[in-house]
Amino acid sequence: MEIKNLTTEQRNPASIHIDTVSTVEMVKIMNEEDQKVALAVGNQDEQIARAIDEAANRYKKGGRLIYLGAGTSGRLGVLDAAELVPTYGIKPERAIGLIAGGPGAMYKAVEGAEDDTNLGAEDLKDLNLNSQDIVLGLAASGRTPYVIGGLEYANQIGAFTISIACVKDSEIGKHAEVAIEAVVGPEIVTGSTRMKSGTAQKMILNMISTGVMIRQGKVFENVMIDVMPTNSKLVDRASRIISAVTDATQEEALQTLKKAENNVPLAITMIKTESNKDEAQKLLEQYNGNVSEVIKNN
C-alpha cells in the first residue's frame, strides 16, 4: 500500500481546526482522540495474549526479548527493554532494543537507515540470534523495510516473531507469526505517529513484557517480588512486600528475609508453605521459581 493511503497518513476530521481553537479545546480534542487508542488496543486482546504465551515459553528456555524498530517505534522498543532490567531484575542481555541507525538514532534521526532491509537482518546477526529468541518488530505504518528485513531473517533462524502496527493488513504482519494491528485511526496532527500510534505501541509493549515477566514468576499476586534488597532502604521495602502478601508482621517478614539470605521469593515461600529455607528452595526449583505455582500446588 502506498504511504498516502495508510490510515495513519489521513487527515483527522476531529482535529481539522485544532490550530484555531482555544488551548483548552485543543487539549480536549487530544484527550478524546487518545481515548480511542485503548479501544483499538483492546480489539487485539487475543493476538496480544498469543504473543505473551509463546514469548513466555521461549524466554523461560533462555530466549531474549529483542525489539526492532525505526524512529518513534524503535525508541519505544529501546525504552521497554531498558525498563525491564531495574523493574524485574533481569540481566540486560535478556532484553535488547534495536533502532535503525544504531544507538545515536535515539536522539537524532539517521537518514535512510529505516529504508535498508538488510540492516535489520544485520543487526540481528550481530546479536547471534537463535531459535529461542523473541523478535518484536514495530512500525506504526506497518511497512518499514528495516523491520521487514529483520523479521524475515528471524523467521529463517526460527525465532518467534511478533509484529506491532497501527494499520490493518500490514506488511510487517505478513512476516510475523503473530500480527498485532491496533488501528487507532488518523493522527491528531496528520502523520505524526508519535502520538496515537506511539501510545498504542507503548500500551502493547507494556502488556507483552509485563505478561512475559508475570509468567516467569516475577510477580506474586500483583506485587513485584524479584527485587534485590542491596541496601537498608530496599531491605525495608522487601520486608514490607513480604508482609503484604503473607500477612506476617513486618518484623516476622524481616527475620524470614534474613534466613532466606535476602531472597524475597524464597522468604515468601517459606512463610506461605510453613517450610524452612531448604524445603522452600526445593519447592521453588520444582516449579521453576514461580511462587504462585508453588502456593497453588502446596
Curated annotation (Swiss-Prot):
Keywords: Carbohydrate metabolism, Lyase. Specifically catalyzes the cleavage of the D-lactyl ether substituent of MurNAc 6-phosphate, producing GlcNAc 6-phosphate and D-lactate. Homodimer. CDD domains: SIS_Etherase. A lyase-type mechanism (elimination/hydration) is suggested for the cleavage of the lactyl ether bond of MurNAc 6-phosphate, with the formation of an alpha,beta-unsaturated aldehyde intermediate with (E)-stereochemistry, followed by the syn addition of water to give product. The active site is at residues 83, 114. It comes from the Bacteria. Residues 55-218 form the SIS domain. Pathway: Amino-sugar metabolism; N-acetylmuramate degradation. One of its GO terms (biological process) is amino sugar catabolic process. It catalyses: N-acetyl-D-muramate 6-phosphate + H2O = N-acetyl-D-glucosamine 6-phosphate + (R)-lactate. The keyword Lyase applies. Its EC number is 4.2.1.126. InterPro entries: Etherase_MurQ, Glucokinase_regulatory_CS, MURQ/GCKR, SIS_dom, SIS_dom_sf. Gene3D superfamilies: 1.10.8.1080, Glucose-6-phosphate isomerase like protein, domain 1. The gene is murQ. It is an enzyme of class 4 (lyase). PANTHER family: GLUCOKINASE REGULATORY PROTEIN. One of its GO terms (molecular function) is carbon-oxygen lyase activity. This is N-acetylmuramic acid 6-phosphate etherase. Belongs to the GCKR-like family. MurNAc-6-P etherase subfamily.
